[in-house]
């Protein structure tokens, strides 16, 4: 190895117990090694009729003198030469065409071998980037089919030739066959521009895989794939929502598949006669024994710390003033009942929908609150479609039933007296959730017209 280069000292030692005359010699070891170069590999994307210059630099080599270089495109020799005092060699292409796209290799050679720089020069367009925060993407809701508003931006649209079209591929989840069509593009795509295409005649409630490939005069660019799913719109233009859990589908609330057990719909009139005493409500929030509510049953076999999570439907919202300092405010309120000596914890989360799902702690309360219904009010400021999650955590014993009722969402902030009294009287912790969207690209995306 080249690290072994250097001066070595050799000395005599005793021979069969006899002293010998001390002698020593110095030996210099010189290890020759081929040139180390950079870049080892570099991709260059450039449009036709444009120029490009590639540069291969020597980092170290031994011997450093009498270095030669060769530039090749594939197997075709382009240029050879010898280094003088410079530490790099360049190869320019004045005007790119189909004939001079490809892999360029620069070999720098000495007596010990060669180092190589490789350059992939291509006219391929970069992959598009799907936009996952489309407001109300299920824009048509017919009986058996639905339509989906697909949106995306183009990464570095000016890096190569103008994108003239996109090849759209779509297939139903679980199927093998792709259906393809071309989406024509008129004019130049600007960086950050939001492009929209409506997918129609999609079968409810099937999910679909979508593939998008940009096309230029060079040919196909890089593809990107996403999955779209049908979700029944609830209050697509959210103004007010109220759920007392009286209807059969419990207002489209659903159980979380990742928890330990489920919430249960119940009324006092229909509950099991073997219910655990000294815990749980005696009536719904209105005082009716026939009225329903949702609760967690903490009797055996439930264990301390186990969780039950109840998910609200997805609410779609549209920012009213994307240039303003705030998002639209909503007042989220609900009634909760936490009575029993073994009460655990009731948490509420705000889940924002997007490319990555984010859950923000919104409200929390724990411990025995007495045999009564309590009310909570919290301001929320969602920036995109959202869900609310009720999480009940089992306490140390069976007398730990937790119930909720009359969940409401109304546009506008909660009254100050509600926030001041309802959230503090029982020791609950209310958290105002302010989530701001900083990147200017999102503001541009929201305002960009559909193509």
Curated annotation (Swiss-Prot):
Does the record carry Lipoprotein as a key word?
yes
- Which CDD domains does the entry link to? MAM (cd06263)
Q: Which cysteine pairs make disulfide bonds?
A: 56-106
The highest taxon in the source lineage is Eukaryota
**Which InterPro entries does the UniProt record give?**
ConA-like_dom_sf, FN3_dom, FN3_sf, Ig-like_dom, Ig-like_dom_sf, Ig-like_fold, MAM_dom, MAM_domain-containing
Propeptide at 427-451
Would you tell me the protein name for this molecule? MAM domain-containing glycosylphosphatidylinositol anchor protein 2
What species is this protein from? Macaca fascicularis (Crab-eating macaque)
Annotated gene: MDGA2
